[in-house]
UniProtKB/Swiss-Prot annotation:
Protein name: Transketolase
EC class name: transferase
One Gene Ontology term of the molecular function aspect: metal ion binding
NCBIfam families: PRK05899.2-4, tktlase_bact
Cofactors (names): Mg(2+); Ca(2+); Mn(2+); Co(2+)
SMART domains, per database record: Transket_pyr
Residues that bind thiamine diphosphate: H62, G109, P110, L111, G151, N180, H252, F423
Binding-site residues, Mg(2+): D150, N180, V182
């Protein structure tokens, strides 16, 4: 037990040094992490993101010091990094933060999402294992472990993702519950009254209950590995054990004091000094956690050597390297669409068909709307065919997004998912977390404006684009035709470290002669030009057609008009000043048009003489889509009034 106590002592000291932290879980759940990492967990100390490593997700991320203490004694985190806990060091931040070169498999902290990402990791593993089973059944035979707290299990997303894990029989998933019956404001029983055994068994899980004795946790994990179902292990723990706030909800977060250290030393019969731990402890951890990994990695490398001449091996390496350039560069042809003058969602179907080949590693998730959004490759799904690229999630948008993040974190897979734009809010917390981790997930949102029509204001998403654009590292495309759609689709396929969102229409849009897929990647470009224009009109998506119609009216009045198509305002705002000044004219007026409440359009005011914006700032109604669109001011008469006011 002294090795476990050493990690707990380090945890207390590191949190005291940081001037406070989540002592309760970091101490109480430490037997879970200790048993896992000293007996079961497989990874490569020299290659943190080795494809066949076990994955560990601390969904209750506030217990991070329990993990960092083990990493320190095993030689994976330095003394200096421990001393910087919560003070600017990514490897020991308050909540675990994923990086491409560290030993954290997912950024966590927003409760429930770690559970969902773990489900995504195991789903990705299952898909990859099936894809390459002809090579070997040992290429993807790892486990994913996730530690959850009571807060994780109270979040709605945990219910969503646990059903998915049960439906798809993700038996490589082992969830360990830090069941301490206490949370920040109260005892758990005051806010939760469910039977966890019944809850998980009802959705196809294996359930195990144990106390926090190391040997019992060990045996529970061994038993879980023998199951053909995902396993939920409820571990009875004690929050802030061996401190003055033991088993009290005040123990969730506090600053350890001298009384705590005296209590700890008395109850554990230890006498450690902060960062003056015996060499024998470091030696034991390196032998127990690190040295046992060598044979596992050596066996895997030998397996790869034996497979390198197999026909599937090149595909395997392209997939696990996430070499999206090799997989998708020059795969799309904007000219090969079934029908022009279509809704931009229809082009999605065309482009998905173009990359529907055995080398593509794209998998599509949808929230029960594939027949409306066309986020689907072929006609089957995973329930019917283990080789299918389509994964039905049901009406679980938040679960879908957390699972997508987990699949991207696992590696080897490109993942696309989506729903109607009005429901992007359901996924927003996971979109934000994926962007924070620089994950190349790909969202498609359709039904993007008032012209959804009869479904009414609940389905008319005037307010969603600014929400998506406001998230750092999220690249939002709103194309106006097939060429711009192709560019946005291609950008999403090739992205290595950025979340891509493609926003598409349900209503048909006319194909436009002068649109340009290459220029689309600048975010905006001149679609129609007149030198020394009196007026510049900039628009995105369906409003580009309205701009073209208005230009025809003004041309008859001898007004010189320049039209800018702006399919990606975020990319455009990142262009240099020279390019931006080439689009605008200091002597011209500017009208910007978009059926959304986005504020970014006002950033262009400084480049022109004066500026007015036609946007959408109110809910719609249930009526004919074109009628609602017109009533909300997206018509030639309204534009003429705006132009007249600018001239005056």
């Amino acid at each position: 037990m002294k090795y476990l106590y050493a990690t707990q002592h380090l945890t207390l000291n590191a949190i005291k040094h940081a001037k406070g932290g989540h002592v309760g879980m970091a101490i109480g759940a430490s037997p879970i992490l200790f048993s896992l990492f000293t007996k079961h967990f497989h990874f490569d100390p020299d290659q943190p993101k080795w494809i066949n490593r076990d994955r560990f997700v601390l969904s209750a991320g506030h217990g991070s010091m329990a993990l960092y203490s083990i990493f320190h004694f095993a030689g994976l985190i330095s003394k200096q990094e421990i001393l910087q806990h919560k003070h600017g060091q990514i490897n020991t931040s308050s909540h675990p933060e994923y990086a491409p070169n560290n030993f954290i498999d997912a950024s966590t902290g927003p409760l429930g999402q770690g559970f969902g990402m773990a489900v995504g990791m195991v789903l990705a593993q299952k898909l990859l294992a099936n894809e390459f089973k002809e090579l070997s059944d040992k290429l993807f035979d790892h486990y994913t472990y996730v530690v959850v707290g009571d807060g994780d299990l109270q979040e709605g997303v945990s219910y969503e993702v646990s059903q998915i894990a049960g439906l798809y029989k993700l038996n490589k998933l082992i969830v360990l519950h830090d069941s301490n019956r206490v949370q920040m404001d109260s005892e758990v029983k005051k806010v939760a009254n469910e039977n966890l055994k019944v809850r998980f068994e009802n959705v196809g899980w294996n359930y195990i209950h144990t106390d926090d004795q190391l040997e019992n946790i060990d045996q529970a994990i061994i038993k879980a590995k023998q199951s053909d179902k995902p396993t939920f292990i409820e571990v009875r723990t004690t929050i802030a054990k061996n401190t003055h706030l033991e088993d009290q909800y005040g123990g969730h977060w506090f600053i350890p004091n001298e009384v705590d250290f005296q209590l700890f030393e008395k109850r554990t019969n230890t006498n450690f000094n902060f960062f003056n731990y015996p060499d024998s402890i470091y030696h034991w951890f390196k032998q127990t956690v690190i040295e046992r990994q060598k044979q596992i990695k050596e066996d895997y490398n030998n397996l790869l050597i034996s497979l390198k001449d197999k026909p599937l091996f090149k595909k395997f390496t392209n997939w696990i390297d996430s070499d999206f350039q090799a997989l998708y560069l020059n795969q799309l042809d904007e000219k090969k669409v079934a029908k022009k003058d279509s809704a931009t969602r229809n082009y999605l179907k065309d482009f998905l068909n173009q990359i529907n080949n055995p080398n593509s590693n794209l998998y599509c998730l949808n929230a029960d709307v594939s027949r409306s959004c066309f986020i689907k490759i072929g006609d089957d799904n995973l329930h019917e065919n283990p080789c299918s690229r389509n994964i039905q999630i049901g009406i679980r948008e938040f679960a879908m997004a957390t699972i997508m993040n987990g699949m991207a974190l696992h590696g080897g897979i490109k993942v696309m998912g989506g729903t109607f734009l009005a429901f992007a809010d359901y996924s927003k917390p996971a979109i934000r977390l994926g962007a924070l981790m620089n994950l190349p997930v790909f969202y498609v949102y359709t039904h993007d404006s008032y012209q959804v029509g009869g479904d009414g204001p609940t389905h008319q998403p005037y307010d969603q684009l600014p929400m998506l654009r406001a998230i750092e590292n999220v690249c939002v495309f709103r194309p106006c035709d097939e060429k711009e759609t192709c560019a946005g689709f291609n950008y999403g396929l090739l992205s290595q470290d950025q979340t891509t969102v493609l926003v598409l229409t349900r209503q048909p849009l006319k194909s436009i002669d002068n649109t340009d897929s290459l220029k689309t990647l600048k975010g905006g470009y001149i679609l129609l030009d007149r030198k020394q224009p009196d007026l510049i009109i900039a628009a995105s998506g369906s409003e580009v057609q309205l701009a073209i119609e208005f230009e025809k009216v003004l041309t008859k009045q001898n007004v010189k008009v320049r039209i800018l198509s702006v399919p990606n305002i975020t990319l455009l705002l990142k262009q240099d000043e020279k390019y931006l000044k080439s689009l605008f004219d200091a002597n011209s007026s500017l009208i910007t048009i978009e059926a959304s409440s986005s504020y970014e359009w006002f950033c262009f005011k400084k480049y022109v003489k004066n500026h007015a914006h036609l946007g959408a700032f109110s809910f719609g109604e249930s009526d004919d889509g074109d009628k609602v669109y017109q009533q909300k001011g997206f018509n030639l008469e309204r534009l003429m009034k705006i132009f007249t006011s600018l001239r005056n």
